[in-house]
A protein has these predicted regions:
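SAM-dependent methyltransferase
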Residues: 212-213
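Conserved, non-catalytic sequence blocks in retroelement Pol enzymes and Pol-derived host proteins
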Residues: 227-231
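P-loop NTPase motor core of the ASCE superfamily
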Residues: 237-239, 246-255
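Secondary-structure boundary/capping micro-motif
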Residues: 1-209, 219-226, 240, 247, ...
């Protein structure tokens, strides 16, 4: 398409200063997808309205670049998320404490995402350094809790989970099968006897909510980055960004809004 014809296509919207500024802020700073931007603007009934197709055209044509990227930074189009292979591989068996409840025994309310308080648990580690992130994601709201621990062992993970959930009343926890969750019985006793339900080995889709959220975290904390020097305040900031990002599966509400049952002005 000739550039003049392309500019005629986007001029009514992305060449509007207010619309351009809003789209650029939400896409570049908060990493919202074009769909999230478009449908959240509609959800909040903003006077600024733009289709996600128009935003995609602007991205792929480099219209949102405007020379704002620092040397070595990825181009805007490469910020669009693409799914890769899961990190779990067959042939590796972990040792852990006795598994008392299988995921097939998990209450139907948890399976159907009918209530707040059913959590999925995992860790996010790097290939360098011993530190890792312990992540908890509420199944209904997709609300994320995240805390860094000095090393990926059962004691550190136990302490982090208890710390993150001590002020709530979790109903169930579905963790990864790794040995770092071997102290699940101790966690259960500390959290009002919350029940753990373990998935099948090497089937991360049984904890798909957490796996997807960990993928979003990887955008901020790549696998090659040593987490040891990452400040807790930065982790909290990135978790807040994800918790305030609208989701299609939540009818364009954010996890924060669903978890706390409130409405926010995010745009």
């Amino acid at each position: 398409m000739p550039i003049t014809a392309y500019l005629q296509l986007i001029k009514p919207l992305l060449l509007n200063a207010n619309i351009y500024k809003t789209v650029q802020l939400l896409f570049l700073q908060y990493q919202w997808s074009p769909e999230q931007i478009s449908f959240r603007l509609k959800h909040e009934k903003k006077p600024i309205q733009i289709s996600y197709a128009t935003i995609y055209r602007g991205i792929y044509r480099g219209f949102l670049e405007e020379g704002k990227l620092s040397p070595g930074q990825r181009g805007v189009a490469r910020k669009l998320r693409h799914r890769g292979e899961t990190r779990h591989k067959n042939g590796c068996i972990e040792t852990r404490g006795k598994i008392s409840h299988h995921i097939s025994e998990r209450p139907e309310q948890a399976n159907q995402r009918e209530r707040i308080g059913d959590w999925e648990a995992d860790t996010v580690a790097s290939v360098t350094g011993k530190a890792c992130l312990v992540t908890l994601v509420d199944r209904k709201s997709r609300y994320l809790l995240c805390e860094k621990v000095a090393k990926k062992d059962s004691i550190s993970v136990k302490q982090a989970i208890i710390h993150m959930l001590k002020d709530s009343r979790p109903k169930t926890i579905t963790p990864d099968r790794g040995k770092e969750f071997s102290r699940h019985e101790e966690i259960s006793k500390a959290l009002n006897d919350v029940q753990f339900y373990f998935p099948e080995p090497h089937q991360p889709w049984q904890r798909g909510t957490n796996e997807n959220t960990n993928g979003l975290l990887r955008e901020y904390f790549p696998k090659k980055q040593d987490l040891t020097e990452i400040k807790p305040s930065l982790i909290r900031d990135k978790a807040l960004i994800l918790n305030q990002r609208p989701r299609k599966c939540l009818n364009w509400k954010s996890p924060f809004e669903v978890y706390f049952n409130i409405s926010l002005h995010l745009t």
